[in-house]
C-alpha cells in the first residue's frame, strides 16, 4: 500500500526587537516584539499511517518523541478538533539547534499544522491554523505565517510588516541550554533596558538597514547574560569581529549578527568557528508562508 507523504520546511526565527511590558493575570508575560524568519530550517516528513497513532522520529537525541514534542501536540490537536481517525509518522530532520531561542520546536509544530492540513484535506485557512497554533505555544502562530511581523499579547497576536533588507545572519550558539521560564522569572522590568520596538517598525518599513542595526534590542539580554556570562562573551566577540549589529535571540543562548558584505561575513564566520561550537551563516528570509 502506498502511503501518502509530504515534506515540509520549518524555518527558524530571530527577534530584531523584543520587549516585555508586564506580567499578565494568566501567568504569561505581555510582550511586544519583531520576529523575522531566516534561511535555517528543519525538514519534516509527514507520512500517513493506517493505525490511529502519532509517531515522532528523529536522529537528534535531544528531540522528544512523545507529548513533550510540539509537533506531536500539533498533530494531536488537529486529530482531536477535527475527529481525524488516521495516524501520522513525523520524521524531524533537525538543523535548527534545540533550546536555542530560535523557535525550532514552534516552527516544527507550525510546519506540522500546515502539512497535516494538506495531508488530511482539512481545508483550514492559514489564519485558522495560526489560531490553533496559539493553543500549542506563544511562537507557533508567528511560525505558521512566517515572514516579518510585530507580535503582541503573549506573542500570538500577529501584525505583518515589510521584509527587512536582505543581509547575512551569523548565528552562534554556546553549548548550553537556557530555561525560558528561568529567564522570565529573573526579569525585573524596572532594571533592564527596553528597546524601541516602534522605531524598529519604522526603519524596517523604510528599508533602512543602518537604522535596523542601530535599533536592535532585547530586554531579556541582561538577564540571560547574568545567568550565563558566556553568552555575553559571544556577543562581545561578534562585535569585535565587525558585525553590523549583534543581539541575543529570544531568551537565548543563541547570539546573531547582521552583516551586509560577503567578505566580512566569511571573516566573522571563520573567527567564530574557533570560539564557538555551533556557528551558522544564513540569509535573512522574511518570506511569508503560503498554503499550496
Swiss-Prot record:
EC number annotated for this UniProt entry: 2.7.1.148
Positions that bind ATP: 97-107
Record pathway: Isoprenoid biosynthesis; isopentenyl diphosphate biosynthesis via DXP pathway; isopentenyl diphosphate from 1-deoxy-D-xylulose 5-phosphate: step 3/6
Tagged with keyword GTP-binding: no
Highest taxon of the lineage: Bacteria
Gene Ontology molecular-function annotations: 4-(cytidine 5'-diphospho)-2-C-methyl-D-erythritol kinase activity; ATP binding
BP GO terms, sorted: isopentenyl diphosphate biosynthetic process, methylerythritol 4-phosphate pathway; terpenoid biosynthetic process
Enzyme class, broadest EC rank: transferase
SUPFAM superfamilies listed in its UniProt record: GHMP Kinase, C-terminal domain, Ribosomal protein S5 domain 2-like
Catalytic site positions: 13, 139
Catalytic activity: 4-CDP-2-C-methyl-D-erythritol + ATP = 4-CDP-2-C-methyl-D-erythritol 2-phosphate + ADP + H(+)
Presence of the UniProt keyword Kinase in the record: yes
Alphabetically ordered keywords of this record: ATP-binding, Isoprene biosynthesis, Kinase, Nucleotide-binding, Transferase
UniProt-listed PANTHER family: 4-DIPHOSPHOCYTIDYL-2-C-METHYL-D-ERYTHRITOL KINASE, CHLOROPLASTIC
Job description of the protein: Catalyzes the phosphorylation of the position 2 hydroxy group of 4-diphosphocytidyl-2C-methyl-D-erythritol.
Family: Belongs to the GHMP kinase family. IspE subfamily.
Protein name: 4-diphosphocytidyl-2-C-methyl-D-erythritol kinase
Gene: ispE
Amino acid at each position: 500500500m502506498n502511503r501518502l507523504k509530504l515534506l515540509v520546511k520549518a524555518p527558524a526565527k530571530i527577534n530584531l526587537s523584543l520587549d516585555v511590558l508586564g506580567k499578565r493575570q494568566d501567568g504569561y508575560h505581555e510582550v511586544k516584539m519583531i520576529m523575522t524568519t531566516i534561511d535555517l530550517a528543519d525538514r519534516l516528513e509527514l507520512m500517513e499511517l493506517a493505525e490511529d497513532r502519532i509517531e515522532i522520529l528523529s536522529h537528534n537525541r535531544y528531540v522528544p518523541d512523545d507529548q513533550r514534542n510540539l509537533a506531536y501536540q500539533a498533530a494531536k490537536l488537529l486529530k482531536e478538533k477535527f475527529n481525524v481517525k488516521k495516524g501520522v509518522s513525523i520524521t524531524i530532520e533537525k538543523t535548527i539547534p534545540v533550546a536555542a531561542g530560535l523557535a525550532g520546536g514552534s516552527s516544527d509544530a507550525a510546519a506540522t499544522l500546515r502539512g497535516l492540513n494538506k495531508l488530511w484535506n482539512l481545508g483550514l485557512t492559514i489564519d485558522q491554523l495560526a489560531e490553533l497554533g496559539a493553543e500549542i505555544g506563544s511562537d507557533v502562530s508567528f511560525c505558521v505565517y512566517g515572514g516579518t511581523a510585530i507580535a503582541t499579547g503573549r506573542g500570538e497576536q500577529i501584525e505583518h510588516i515589510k521584509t527587512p533588507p536582505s543581509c547575512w545572519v551569523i548565528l552562534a550558539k554556546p553549548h548550553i541550554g537556557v530555561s525560558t521560564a528561568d529567564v522570565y522569572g529573573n526579569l525585573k522590568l524596572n532594571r533592564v533596558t527596553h528597546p524601541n520596538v516602534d522605531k524598529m517598525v519604522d526603519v524596517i518599513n523604510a528599508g533602512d538597514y543602518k537604522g535596523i542595526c542601530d535599533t536592535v534590542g532585547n530586554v531579556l539580554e541582561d538577564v540571560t547574560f547574568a545567568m550565563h556570562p558566556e553568552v555575553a562573551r559571544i556577543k562581545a566577540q561578534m562585535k569585535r569581529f565587525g558585525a553590523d549589529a549583534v543581539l541575543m535571540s529570544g531568551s537565548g543562548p543563541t547570539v546573531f549578527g547582521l552583516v551586509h558584505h560577503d567578505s566580512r561575513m566569511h571573516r566573522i564566520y571563520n573567527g567564530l568557528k574557533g570560539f564557538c561550537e555551533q556557528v551558522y551563516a544564513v540569509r535573512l528570509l522574511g518570506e511569508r508562508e503560503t498554503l499550496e
